[in-house]
Design a protein with these regions (language model features):
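Cytosolic regulatory regions of ion transport systems
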Residues: 1-171
């Protein structure tokens, strides 16, 4: 079985590396040849087939293995909402039982992805904002959360302490 990973930027690369470390196969589609070249130089423990193509085109997804019986899921991780939406729609229309996970940067795209039955929708900016808000509002809950998801655990004494006065968060 394998996952079809569309987009080999920072997120796609980290995900493919983690999948390979766990002996889970992946096929990568990215529109940029330099990213495909980087994948070939990454020295992964498993071979990872890659295709330099526009993942928003259903024919390219099909060529990469979307309808292959061993494809167990599609991960739309490009930097463009338009492309991720096209990947999710094509995946859901061609094989509705196939798991689809998509990255998004806007509420409008989130709503569109949800309307097509996307299994999981991740907005990295909203997720990070929620993470920061938890740290500010509930430092000990944040610490427990960090223990659960972070491989480099912090000590209990390292919970964030509230600084007096007003905060300015930029970004």
């Amino acid at each position: 079985p394998f996952y079809l990973v569309c987009g080999y930027g920072v997120t796609g690369r980290l995900l493919v590396h983690q999948l390979a470390k766990r002996d889970i196969r992946a096929v990568v589609v990215d529109i940029r040849q330099d990213r495909i070249d980087a994948l070939e130089l990454d020295n992964l423990p498993l071979p990872v087939p890659a295709l330099c193509a526009d993942a928003s085109l259903p024919d390219m997804l099909d060529h990469a293995g979307l309808q292959h019986p061993k494809c167990i899921g599609v991960l739309a991780l490009t930097n463009e909402d338009r492309v991720n939406l096209a990947i999710a729609i094509a995946s859901q229309l061609l094989l509705p039982e196939r798991q689809v996970i998509s990255r998004t940067n806007s509420d409008l795209t989130t709503a569109n992805l949800a309307s097509f039955g996307t299994d999981m929708i991740v907005d990295p900016f909203r997720a990070y904002a929620d993470y920061l808000a938890l740290a500010a509002r509930s430092p000990h809950k944040h610490l427990v959360y960090d223990w659960l998801i972070n491989p480099r655990h912090r000590h209990l004494a390292s919970a964030y302490k509230h600084a007096e006065g007003r905060w300015i968060i930029c970004g």
